Amino acid sequence: MKIANTFIKRGAAGGLDLSQAPGVTLTLAERRRSRQRLDLDEGRGELGMAIERGQTLRDGDVLVAEDGTYVVVRAALEDVARVTAATPWQLARAAYHLGNRHVLLEIAEQHLQFEYDAVLIDMLAQLGGVTAMRLRAVFEPDVGAYGGGHRHGHDESFGDDYALAQAAYHAHEAHPHAHSHAGGHGHVHSGHGHGGKHGEHDAES
């Protein structure tokens, strides 16, 4: 199985010849995972993905396999709520209330989109001047500097693909890391100091 450990953002992929490149259709949850096994569209095989953690793939991004093969990412249609408002102020107010609930939010000039949630729809109905419509659409929220949402610990990407993820991870991490020990053993590692007992170190995730 080929492994893709990097990708090209859609804005930089304009000069690539993708006429024969296979595609892979992914939901937002899948596009946020860094390590997984992918089934290519139209039965064109499988691809292992092991990109840098914290990345979110977008529609039109291009995965690059180790042998140089390109695979075009396509965003799947998802169950979303599209919010419109009578005035820009009312739309901004809706965005404020959704943001307070840590909702992954796609912000467009004339509307907002979020993963459909009936409770949030009821909340918006109480604001006045706001309309929420349920539909199937591509969902590409602005994850911003925070990475988006409440994702803690490892990506939810291992499961049945644990063996692939481990192999891909070790291949990705094979390059040496600079780690200076100049000045003796006085360096400090994040998450623990050397003044305590070594048996009490927290396991790094």
From Swiss-Prot:
Region (Disordered): 171-205
Domain of life per record: Bacteria
Compartments in which it is found: Cytoplasm
Keyword Kinase in record: no
Chief localisation class: cytoplasm
Keyword field contains Chaperone: yes
A Pfam family assignment: UreE_N
GO molecular function per UniProt: nickel cation binding; unfolded protein binding
Biased amino acid composition, Basic residues: 177-196
Signal peptide boundaries: none
Annotated SUPFAM superfamilies: Urease metallochaperone UreE, C-terminal domain (SSF69737), Urease metallochaperone UreE, N-terminal domain (SSF69287)
Entry GO CC: cytoplasm
Keywords attached to this entry: Chaperone, Cytoplasm, Nickel, Nickel insertion
HAMAP family according to UniProt: UreE (MF_00822)
Family under the similarity heading: Belongs to the UreE family.
Biological role stated in the UniProt entry: Involved in urease metallocenter assembly. Binds nickel. Probably functions as a nickel donor during metallocenter assembly.
Name of this protein: Urease accessory protein UreE
Source organism (scientific name): Bordetella parapertussis (strain 12822 / ATCC BAA-587 / NCTC 13253)
Lineage: Bacteria, Pseudomonadati, Pseudomonadota, Betaproteobacteria, Burkholderiales
This protein's encoding gene: ureE
